[in-house]
Amino acid sequence: MTPSGRPRPLEASRAVKAESPAPFVLASASPRRLALLRQAGLEPSVVIAPEIDEALRKGELPRAYALRVAIAKIEAVIAKERGSFVLAADTVVAVGRRILPKADSEVDVELCLRLLSGRRHVVLTALALKPPAKPMRTRVVATRVAFKVLSKREIDGYVASGEGIGKAGGYAVQGRAEAFVRWINGSYSNVVGLPLYETLALLEGSGWVSARHRV
């Protein structure tokens, strides 16, 4: 309501709700993470693609690897964004202790699908959030997925579609590969690339979301 008792104009109300105590920076090059945040009503002030070394270290396990990379993404941009809430994430697909590659080629996609065919695997996303003037907060979210047994025709068709290129584990669950999934135990959005519930909880726990929606 305005001081005169009249309802606040819709545009003004939206403008107030869009305010935040500090800028929100997404340290990720993933269009899927940006789309998921927008789906949840969150629009980053800035999107930065961090330049880091994501090479797997000898003996590194999936959870430790994902967390290390997510933290490295924060560290790569935080010097220029100290007054911001900086969010980073890294998603890996693993069969047991083996981390499947982010598919850079059709050969990678085929390799991943053959490894996933008829088996269970885990999708891990490490979240890292650096609020202004506060310690970094982290969380790792796991979703278990089971694939049906894939025929050669299904594998060849998916490889030829090009959909798996650039995806962790060589597939996109939100696309044609959804037909390969027998069941999912855990966050579906985590398999896409960002666990929304846990991300919002991390932001809210840091004070960003609650302040953002204060009217």
Which residues are covered by each model-predicted region?
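Short loop/helix-cap segments at secondary-structure boundaries that form the rim of catalytic
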Residues: 36-39, 57, 79-80
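A short linear boundary/processing microfeature
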Residues: 42-43, 53, 119, 161
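Cofactor-binding loop segments of dinucleotide-utilizing enzymes, especially the Rossmann-like FAD-
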Residues: 29, 50, 132
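N-terminal beta1-alpha1 ligand-phosphate binding loop
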Residues: 17-42
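Anionic-ligand binding patches
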Residues: 13-25, 60-215
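Short glycine-rich, Thr/Ser-proximal phosphate-binding strand/loop in the N-terminal lobe
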Residues: 44-59, 136-142
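Intrinsic, low-complexity polybasic segments
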Residues: 4-8
